[in-house]
Amino acid sequence: MVRLSSRFYLQIVFLAFALMTGVPVYSWGLTGHRTIAEIAQQHLTNKSRKELKKLIGRETLAWWANWPDFIKSDSTWNHASPWHYVDLPGNMEKQKFIEDLKKLPGKNLYTQIQTMLADLGNQTLPADQRRTALYFLIHLVGDLHQPLHVGRDEDAGGNKIVVYWFDRKTNLHSLWDNMLIEYQQYSYTEYANLLNTREPDQVKTWQASPLEDWFYESHVISDSIYAASPNEAKLGYKYNFQFQKILDEQLLKGGVRLAALLNQVLSK
């Protein structure tokens, strides 16, 4: 019960802070992250479900999917901001991209997914540390599948590119974080159930590819987004039609791959 009330308090503080300061809600927004988490929940093994119950009781993955964004209003977590993205030049060949991804300095989205996965699977660590690793892992795998979290440094992953979504001024990153998803007009449970219909063989193929391939997929998609979304572009129905399939597939991939990682470390 203590964690419940703390979570609600943290949500209120974060949302109030965002409204007062104009800070954007980051990385897929609430609906996107919860959709990915709900899809993952549906692909967990029984063993993983039992292990998660020991850590978070009856709470769901979707419940904690946005916690790493909520804590951005707490300055003690400022060091975690770079964990949500990687920035590399555009239009890179796969081998060069992966080489440069592995050489990026400091802690970032690539390094921290691996760190959180290792911490979650380490049963010698305190439960609180493993819970924190779980919350971040849920969220960061979602961030990875938002293509502009594998964007370009010169425009801060699209944050500096102004676009107009049905005449509403915004930036390219926010469009992909929130507006495209909200335009579909589904709750996260509706969206998850709608998307979670692929054949098992396709799901297994997505899950089996290495982490570096997931990053490169997002990189390639981000290149296509940049090409279709120049500064001051006016976007609407045509843009949604162009990218809806990609949007849906990224959410689904994020969910089934998150489940694969959780099953990997919790079903031992």
Feature-to-residue mapping (PLM):
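N-terminal signal peptide c-region/cleavage motif recognized by signal peptidases
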Residues: 22-24
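Bacterial N-terminal signal peptides that target proteins for export
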Residues: 2-13
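N-terminal, motif-rich segments that launch catalysis or mediate targeting to/interaction with membranes
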Residues: 26-140, 147, 152-268
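Hydrophobic helical h-region of N-terminal Sec-dependent signal peptides
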Residues: 14-19
